[in-house]
């Protein structure tokens, strides 16, 4: 798992192909928690990439950050 940037609000990483974006076993949020070594870390999906697609993903580290980032994606 390659993390490009992280702070207390967001985390930017490379999603490999073959991995789902959603929070389910083996999905990106779970992989980030595993990478951080914190099974209870708040990691929320802001946008999705198809499972077959590799690319950069932005994930939120709090509910408030997720809401703000989701608004920006919709705009």
Give, region by region, the residue ranges found by the protein language model.
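RNA pseudouridine synthases
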Residues: 1-75
């Amino acid at each position: 798992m390659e993390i490009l940037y992280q702070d207390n609000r967001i985390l930017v990483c490379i999603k490999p192909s073959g991995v789902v974006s959603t929070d389910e076993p083996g999905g990106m949020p779970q992989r980030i928690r595993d990478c951080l070594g914190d099974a209870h870390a708040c990691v929320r999906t802001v946008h999705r990439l198809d499972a077959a697609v590799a690319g950069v993903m932005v994930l939120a580290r709090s509910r408030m950050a997720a809401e703000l980032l989701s608004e920006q994606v919709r705009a």
